[in-house]
Amino acid sequence: MYYDVLKTFIAVVEEKNFTKAAEKLMISQPSVSLHIKNLEKEFQTALLNRSPKHFTTTPTGDILYQRAKQMVFLYEQAKAEIYAHHHYVKGELKIAASFTIGEYILPPLLAQLQKLYPELNLDVMIGNTEEVSERVRMLQADIGLIEGHTNENELEIEPFMEDEMCIAAPNQHPLAGRKEISISDLQNEAWVTREKGSGTREYLDHVLSSNGLRPKSMFTISSNQGVKEAVINGMGLSVLSRSVLRKDLIHREISILHINNFSLKRKLSYIHSPLMENTKNKEIFITMLKSNYQSQLLK
């Protein structure tokens, strides 16, 4: 390629020595000589006045040196601009997120993205896990963030963090004053929960069924805030992410029941369709998602 040949000619003129030019370019001296020979053949003129001890540029060599500097600069500028075009983060990124993630976990990351990439327009749609999966499957979102699992086999799923779940209770509940409880103490309790299709509801159903717990009643509300308000007002217990309860715990509006030798954890994941193009915007988002939360993911 003429770019390499011109760079060789520039190095020879500036170093005034074939050997030094070869060292600078990290190529062999015969390659340097061949490049100069090919240039002289191309332009049908002598570019260098050679002597046993030194050389000088001919008038045509001076012309080529000036133009070669310009051409190399323009080539490298074009290369940098093309790279920037493909790697510059701008445009739109459509994110679908479940309620817990979208309302309590995602906002700090979005603020970080906005600060680093001010020309990136973020379009965040919040719904339950089932709705998020459907949006990604229908290519209405570049990426989805869900709690639990998805039944959409055509989507790719990757965990990005581990979420601590808590059993929330009204402060006046009989179990709230105990340091620890056993899982059997939760038998025949009233529960407040999210709607079907929610990852939080799926997790509660799993906890109840896997431990043989029969609820006295189930009260369904389709928002985390609604569930919390119901618990605060004494309507029952609930299982919610600690991130959802953080402010309520600080203000001591809700109690957490600690179960002896029992851990409540789930994985949060991102999903995307293999049919959707992997854009730079999505790659940047996934990289930041992992760097912010991957340390909280226990393998």
Swiss-Prot record:
Cited Gene3D superfamilies: 3.40.190.290, Winged helix-like DNA-binding domain superfamily/Winged helix DNA-binding domain
Observed effect of gene inactivation: Cannot grow on sulfate, sulfite or butanesulfonate as sole sulfur source.
GO terms classed as biological process: regulation of DNA-templated transcription
PROSITE patterns on file: HTH_LYSR
Gene Ontology MF terms: DNA-binding transcription factor activity; transcription cis-regulatory region binding
DNA-binding region: 18-37
Name under which the protein is recorded: HTH-type transcriptional regulator CysL
Family per similarity comment: Belongs to the LysR transcriptional regulatory family.
Keywords: Activator, DNA-binding, Repressor, Transcription, Transcription regulation
HTH lysR-type domain span: 1-58
Keyword Endoplasmic reticulum: no
Pfam family, any one: HTH_1
DNA-binding recorded as keyword: yes
Function: Transcriptional activator of the cysJI operon which is involved in sulfur assimilation. Also negatively regulates its own transcription.
Induction: Negatively autoregulated.
Taxonomic lineage from the root: Bacteria, Bacillati, Bacillota, Bacilli, Bacillales
